[in-house]
Amino acid sequence: MSDQATALKIKPLGDRILVKREEEDTTSHGGIILPDTAKKKQDRAEVLALGTGKRDKDGQILPFEVKVGDIVLIDKYAGQELTIEGEEYVIVQESEVMAVLN
């Protein structure tokens, strides 16, 4: 678990992963400041914490394919969004992670 996840006291359960989306662009390529309605959600996120793991049919815990600190690609509508102390986080299932980017 990352220091940030520990400080927040968030521990995902099962095959869930706590991620923080990368910061959104606040200006366009031409230098125009974008209003909140024009910003798009980033699909890149940093893995902050891993759950306990998914169990197979024999009850064995399967290892995660990602690790804390990885930059992953997730769908912009994936997971459950939550805001803690003004910061936005997303809890996704491992199956919602499409790729590891690092």
Curated annotation (Swiss-Prot):
Protein name: Co-chaperonin GroES
Subcellular location: Cytoplasm
SUPFAM superfamilies assigned: GroES-like
GO biological process, one term: chaperone cofactor-dependent protein refolding
Stated family: Belongs to the GroES chaperonin family.
Keywords associated with the record: Chaperone, Cytoplasm, Stress response
Any coiled-coil regions, as ranges: none
Keyword DNA damage: no
Subunit structure and binding partners: Heptamer of 7 subunits arranged in a ring. Interacts with the chaperonin GroEL.
Gene Ontology MF annotations: ATP binding; metal ion binding; protein folding chaperone; protein-folding chaperone binding; unfolded protein binding
GO cellular component: cytoplasm
Domain of life the protein comes from: Bacteria
Organism: Chlamydia felis (strain Fe/C-56)
Taxonomic lineage of the native organism: Bacteria, Pseudomonadati, Chlamydiota, Chlamydiia, Chlamydiales
Function field: Together with the chaperonin GroEL, plays an essential role in assisting protein folding. The GroEL-GroES system forms a nano-cage that allows encapsulation of the non-native substrate proteins and provides a physical environment optimized to promote and accelerate protein folding. GroES binds to the apical surface of the GroEL ring, thereby capping the opening of the GroEL channel.
